[in-house]
Amino acid sequence: MNIQEFKQKYNYDVATKMMQQYLDIKFAHLDCLLLFRMGDFYEMFYDDAILASNVLGIALTKRGKNGEEEIAMCGVPYHALEHYLTKLIEANYKVAICDQLETPEDAKNRGGYKAVVTRDVTRIITPGTIIEENLIASAEPNYLASLVIPQNKETASICYVDLSTSEIFVVNVPEAEILNELARLKPREILVSENLRSSNLADSIFKQLNFRITYQVDSCFAINKCKKIILDFYKMKDIKGIGEISSSQICVIGSILEYLSLTQKQNIPHLPIPRIINFHSYMTIDFSTRHNLAIVINSQGSSNGSLLNTINHTVTKQGGRLLYNFLSSPLTNIAKINHRLNITEFFYSNLEIVQRIRELLKKTSDIERCLTRITMNRSSGCDLLSIKYTLEAATIIKGVFFDAYGFNLPDFIEKIIKPLAGDAELYHLIDESIRADVPNNLNDGGIIKHEYHPKVAQLHDLINNRKLHIEKLKDQYRKETGIDSLKISHNNVIGLFIDITAKNVNKILDPKFIHRQTTVNNVRYTTTELQKLESELVNAKTLVISLEKALYADICSQVIKKAAYLRMLASSLSVLDVFCNFAYIADEYDYVKPELTDDLSFDIVKGRHPVVEKVLQRESKSFVYNDCHLSELKRIWLITGPNMAGKSTFLRQNAIIAIIAQIGSFVPAKSAKIGVVDKIFSRIGAADDLIKGQSTFMAEMLETSAILAQSTKNSLIILDEVGRGTSTYDGVSIAWSVLEYIHDKLKCRCLFATHYHELTVMNNFLPALQNYTIAIEESGKDILFLHNIISGAADRSYGIHVAALAGLPASVINRAEQILLKFEKTSTGKGKNILSTESNNLRLFNLEHNQTTIRSKLEEQFRTIDPDQLSPKAALELIYELKKLA
């Protein structure tokens, strides 16, 4: 919509000046909900009002007419803005905050009584650019991402920034891994070029990952423009100052900096030079696997019942975020993993220190986000106090280490706690200047201690002792004049005045007493001294707030100079919190230090599922542990057994153990030896993807296809019931061929659970495959699931027993047992069908032999063909011959 169409739609020419001002600002922010400050309210008009009233659950009213059209309106109190912003941001809306830049009095002085108060947008709030503590989750990052896919489409670039903590990163990602990387980052908002709007990728980001996409015009990603933005922002002369970065990385960094500048109205915190991330330095976990394993959120989108929720006993917000990042990005470098494990082991061996540190960490604050608010002029005195208390606690924490170890700490611990020495100068600055009972709002005053600045003390003295100052002056004038009845009074016409009776006029001899007014019985005077006192009393509140703001800004500027140190301190405290947390859960839940190797070992003794175990503990039940022994020679376990017996739990627990080990934590097992896993893939559960119009089976096949395409020799695959969404013969055939492919081509570690007992014969010709099943006890018709994984193969699934447990009518259960008995009698053996009896002699349909024969005949035929000598008729005949060979 162009400006002419916009003005015509909203009857601009007949609108009031105030409404014209609103429309001018709205046209410049058509992609936003515009909150327009009017006195004590933020108002919304027209379509914005209709939409916001529904989202916020507030009344929709009208504000007169614009021409013949009634103007829809709704509003929220300015002091409750954050409450309503939370709802709008959670609903994925972009919000422009339009503030009054002057008071109504200023407007009158500028342009008379008809002047409209000057207003403009001071900030645009989007899901990816929030910094307010009440609007964002404290225990996870709040990323804004920018994505560029170069024309060659081989490698994409992603830049991601957490504005609330002033962290920025850039990574190159293979095109096939874009969705996996975005699933790892879980950004609140993604910037992409307009030319991707109709792409399959954008569709997948929105529908599969449910992330907000903000489309930007293509020019926002132009390399020359982005390069200039970067150089200007970091005050550099050469782009090499960023490091060795690709053209697409320049584009994503530049585009994200420009977006921050536009939304924050140039008020961007200092961002460090982007940290270049190596995509291969952490484990790849695709979106489906993250969902299936409930790593950071459960299937309902909540953290309850997730792995993160189970092992997160951190005591600080920044520690919680670091643990979130650890879990989202397990390492793949053995040296780095072992470094983390050594730190965990140190704290596990010093649990008394851990207990003391955790108590002290509770006294620290989220100074990363405090510092960002300070640098963006959106802080309160509470942020400064948070820094002060954190500095104090940090110094004590360092003392705890010194008391226990003196100067004999391991180097890797010494490096972590080095920033804890504190900054005495900064601590004393805040301690001496900021009141302990500081209000949240700077406009309320009462931030600065009276003794910090003499003028502050003087003004507060005036405010708090108004009557005393007037009484003091009254006593002085009584002595000077000898008039004992002299009073100092006040009215709204002449303000403060000296009041004497008419008979005492002849005693007023000093010319400093200036006549103001005579009444029937009294005469009123003033003095320069009294006028000054009155002016000070009238202006004291305004003056003290103004002075306190200036002093506060100066103190903040001193804090900003220490930003680099404070960020190091925040990092140190978060690292301490995470590793003390690892030691705590290792002790609390009996976890063990894993051994990491560079082979295909996966040797878990008495492994447990941490989430399920915790749930059972609350119910006073015990978790049944299980072993898992995979190696290069025996790398596939084919697991059969009844439903509800624990197959899926076993699959998940081993994937989770690998993840926990590679973040540097001890693991829930008696012992664990794990060859580093580069990628984990899972195919568990069944659900129709109704949004995409995909059936359960299609969704399953797409996931399985992606797993087979992306896995490497060092990957860990867990598959549950592949092929169950179609007919039995189709399902068995697919499951069989998938197992063959994993065994022969990928040669990676795999746990494969199935109800297709026909597959259990595959160990006869797949040497790396072993059969395992779930132990049960049968007593007549009663069955007890023991949940133990044992060597061997199941010959039935006990599905009817599970159906009975689910409460199906007895008549249905009895009939099902009759039908099952008939099927078993007509089969070639209990629990087997024709596929399994024939499979000892051939790998399913002898595909490999047939394919080789066909291929050799086709190759021989192709060698005899000379394309340049073929006529159209001969070419057609040749096609028919080739078809016969196939």
UniProtKB/Swiss-Prot annotation:
Keyword NADP among record annotations: no
A GO term, aspect molecular function: damaged DNA binding
Keywords: ATP-binding, DNA damage, DNA repair, DNA-binding, Nucleotide-binding
SUPFAM superfamilies registered for this protein in UniProt: DNA repair protein MutS, domain I, DNA repair protein MutS, domain II, DNA repair protein MutS, domain III, P-loop containing nucleoside triphosphate hydrolases
Alphabetized PROSITE patterns for the sequence: DNA_MISMATCH_REPAIR_2
Matching CDD domains: ABC_MutS1 (cd03284)
Pfam families to which the protein is assigned, alphabetical: MutS_I, MutS_II, MutS_III, MutS_IV, MutS_V
Keyword Nucleotide-binding part of the UniProt annotation: yes
Annotated binding of ATP, by residue: 641-648
Matching SMART domains: MUTSac, MUTSd
Disulfide bonds: none
GO BP: any one term: mismatch repair
InterPro entries noted in UniProt: DNA_mismatch_repair_MutS, DNA_mismatch_repair_MutS-lik_N, DNA_mismatch_repair_MutS/MSH, DNA_mismatch_repair_MutS_C, DNA_mismatch_repair_MutS_clamp, DNA_mismatch_repair_MutS_core, DNA_mismatch_repair_MutS_N, DNA_mismatch_repair_MutS_sf
Coiled coil ranges: none
Similarity annotation: Belongs to the DNA mismatch repair MutS family.
NCBIfam families per UniProt: mutS1, PRK05399.1
Role description: This protein is involved in the repair of mismatches in DNA. It is possible that it carries out the mismatch recognition step. This protein has a weak ATPase activity.
Name of this chain's protein: DNA mismatch repair protein MutS
Source taxonomy: Bacteria, Pseudomonadati, Pseudomonadota, Alphaproteobacteria, Rickettsiales
